Amino acid sequence: MISSATKTLQTNNKTIYVAILSTLTFFLFLDYIPGLQAWSAWVTPPVALFLGLIFALTCGQAHPKFNKKTSKYLLQYSVVGLGFGMNLQSALASGKEGMEFTVISVVGTLLIGWFIGRKIFKIDRNTSYLISSGTAICGGSAIAAIGPVLRAKDSEMSVALGTIFILNAIALFIFPAIGHALDMTEHQFGTWAAIAIHDTSSVVGAGAAYGEEALKVATTIKLTRALWIIPMAFATSFIFKSKGQKISIPWFIFFFILAMIANTYLLNGVPQLGAAINGIARKTLTITMFFIGASLSLDVLRSVGVKPLIQGVLLWVVISLSTLAYIYFV
């Protein structure tokens, strides 16, 4: 029988949960009010994820069923909305240059990630694969798209996303400094940043800090790599199908493709509409990160340990050095 003190604690935790979620949502949508946009700048996916993690580790899981169900569907809707931020023609055009290296780097990252995660550190399959996918393609967006196809648990998503976001934050500060130390041209740095930094947002930030040409090169190359979400999602559904289990067709990826096509050919005359839908999708993705973080438990975190972070760091270092070698010697 639950004591009155326990009931009071659970009620308080649920109140705190609602307060955090309401605050995040409130500040997120201040972005649409002229003059108040700056107030929403701090609400980013990493911040939302870590707020969810802090809540879960200090207060426990207030609404586990709500978190699980909401994060599942909101994540898929958000991925579809992200398609309205991509131009298919631009991505394909930028992909013609260096296509061979793009293919090699994506496939190579997945294979190296598998070896480090599964063979060396014995990390669970889903977490290791999500970290490798995020490193190979476009960070959190790739994990958001691949996770539902993989039927990954919220705890596995949290660990993978947390690893990627930590490395993203580090890259945003150290990459420009390393680029200047190595006297890299803006084109070289843009190429390196697009391949070695996970999330598009951090790629854009690092490119902008280095120079205008670096920003342009980094953005176009990263856009091309983001298209790999599509074949990766379908390949994942086939590769990880259990014996006797039907193939899980990632239908939301079809809608992602349709959104991208619509944005390229139907909304090219009204780019504001595509940008608005994409903006809402990014905000719902940020809220989803809170749900995913709030689903983690201290027991899960203890069982996982630091191995996923070590996999992410080692994989990141290997890809960064390999890309540098390609830029300088090929």
Swiss-Prot record:
In the record, the note on similarity to other proteins reads: Belongs to the UPF0324 family.
Q: Where in the cell is it found?
A: Cell membrane
| Transmembrane helix found in the keyword field | yes
Keyword Ubl conjugation attached: no
- An example Pfam family from this entry, by short name, is Cons_hypoth698
Query: Which species is listed as the source?
Result: Bacteroides thetaiotaomicron (strain ATCC 29148 / DSM 2079 / JCM 5827 / CCUG 10774 / NCTC 10582 / VPI-5482 / E50)
Write out the entry's keywords from A to Z.
Answer: Cell membrane, Membrane, Transmembrane, Transmembrane helix
Q: Which PANTHER family match?
A: INNER MEMBRANE PROTEIN YEIH-RELATED, UPF0324 MEMBRANE PROTEIN FN0533
Q: Which GO terms describe its cellular component?
A: plasma membrane
Q: What is the protein's given name?
A: UPF0324 membrane protein BT_4609
Question: Topology with regard to the membrane?
Answer: Multi-pass membrane protein
Q: Which residues cross the membrane?
A: 16-33, 38-60, 73-95, 99-116, 128-150, 160-182, 189-211, 221-240, 247-269, 284-306
